[in-house]
């Protein structure tokens, strides 16, 4: 009878472990699907900074903003006008004489499409830029998928939020600094030592930007990212098996935020995504 009981306990433990591993695999599959989507990070092919006045855009080399081949040679003009009370206005002037004012809100910017090419205006700091995507990009076509560390339940923590709400400076790869809201420090214990990370917010999640010794050879040099649900009763479900690479891994046209200095962990976080072998080289060292 004792043997039966022990066997059932072992089986139950294996079932829980298998269920956890399956949940991580499911997250990895969703991540892969997002990366392969027709407007995901792998489709990013251009980033242009608007100057006051007219900015021509199209595939012809004479344009201010040169799009990939396949786009119209003369797609139009983007006119940046500064209005004293309303702020900056961007108008897309088409060759047929029609025009469209382009919203550049973070939530839902206006998107202009021409075949497989699309673009929209975004704001970074006090500057406006045009982000260009191509659903037929070579990076997307040649994507071989991500590699992951083996699932490691030891790097899944019930962490504690130590409230200390304040704005913290976050540097991006352009050298710009934005002040972001942080709720406090999230602390956890690992192998008898206490560690902490300071997250910011992203939509309805906590957003962690962190570095660790694996960045030297195993993971992306500039660090990785991790999202968690918002705290419940002061507790945070912190699972490093959900760690992923920033968009700068795949393209030089992203504007990735960099981990704050206090988010450098001294131990190797061997969980989550590994460095992409065909990834874009890290060019952020001079900013850190």
Question: Model-predicted segments: where are they?
Answer:
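Extended, aromatic/histidine-rich regions of cofactor-dependent oxidoreductases associated
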Residues: 146, 215-218, 235-237, 241-288
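Flexible, glycine-rich surface segments
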Residues: 160-215, 220
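Surface-exposed beta-loop interaction hotspot
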Residues: 115-178
